[in-house]
């Protein structure tokens, strides 16, 4: 099937779930997950008009769960019990993975990606040179650009439900500070101001005053305190030694 055929198949199954048991449906969904896994298909793609979300691809990911059966997976001394297979062949993909980091099938990891003990969910796209640091989570369908540093404990939200939600987009060169939480629909880019953060911004937790019927209250927000300077870049520069697979760290 070509992409157009796959899209039409998914839209038909989405409207009629009885088709889920059809062998052709299973093959179509599996083909889409395989394309996502190889980075040949994405849940969202950049264009001249901004980011375009492909809802039918998100639908395919959701439909992948019902026809998958729970099964035990043994990885060395560890045991998992889940529906979604794990990614494998990291050496061939040029991806460095530190135990016990986990990435599900259907997530794309480009050559040069480094996973410290972290988690990457199905539908996510992580581009080259990006490091996902310890205990960080890249949620379902999140789109992460090149040379991004996702610091320890960062949570990037997933967006399989509600279906209309736009995925988190982290564009090239961003540095996400430790324990940041980035939720669905937020775009961190190479410039907001509502829903996305301007390029080279320095952001801290803040609040603003919002008027409610009961009075004025402080509401949490991302507070932009300035732009990155040379000194900021020096402090947050990517350590190439950590990205050289032949260097012991």
Q: Which residues are covered by each model-predicted region?
A:
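Terminal amphipathic alpha-helical/low-complexity segments used for targeting or macromolecular assembly
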Residues: 1-95, 200, 206-249
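Structural signal for interior beta-strand "rungs" in well-ordered beta-sheet cores
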Residues: 91, 95-212, 224
């Amino acid at each position: 099937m070509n992409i157009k055929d796959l899209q039409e198949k998914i839209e038909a199954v989405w409207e009629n779930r009885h088709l889920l048991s059809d062998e052709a449906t299973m093959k179509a969904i599996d083909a889409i997950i395989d394309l996502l896994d190889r980075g040949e298909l994405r849940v969202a793609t950049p264009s001249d008009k901004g980011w375009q979300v492909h809802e039918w691809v998100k639908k395919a990911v959701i439909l992948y769960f019902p026809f998958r059966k729970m099964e035990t997976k043994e990885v060395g001394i560890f045991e998992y019990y889940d529906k979604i297979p794990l990614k494998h062949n990291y050496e061939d993909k040029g991806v460095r993975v530190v135990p016990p980091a986990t990435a599900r099938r259907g997530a794309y990891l480009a050559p040069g990606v480094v996973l410290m003990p972290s988690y990457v969910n199905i539908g996510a796209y992580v581009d080259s040179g990006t490091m996902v640091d310890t205990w960080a989570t890249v949620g379902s369908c999140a789109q992460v650009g090149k040379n991004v540093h996702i610091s320890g404990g960062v949570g990037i939200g997933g967006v399989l439900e509600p279906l209309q939600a736009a995925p988190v987009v982290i564009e090239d060169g961003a540095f996400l500070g430790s324990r940041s939480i980035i939720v669905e629909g937020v775009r961190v880019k190479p410039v907001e101001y509502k829903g996305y953060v301007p390029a080279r911004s320095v952001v801290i937790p803040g609040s603003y005053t919002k008027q409610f019927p009961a009075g004025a209250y402080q509401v949490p927000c991302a507070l932009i305190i300035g732009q990155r300077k040379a000194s900021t870049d020096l402090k947050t520069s990517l350590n190439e030694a950590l990205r050289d697979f032949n260097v012991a760290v």
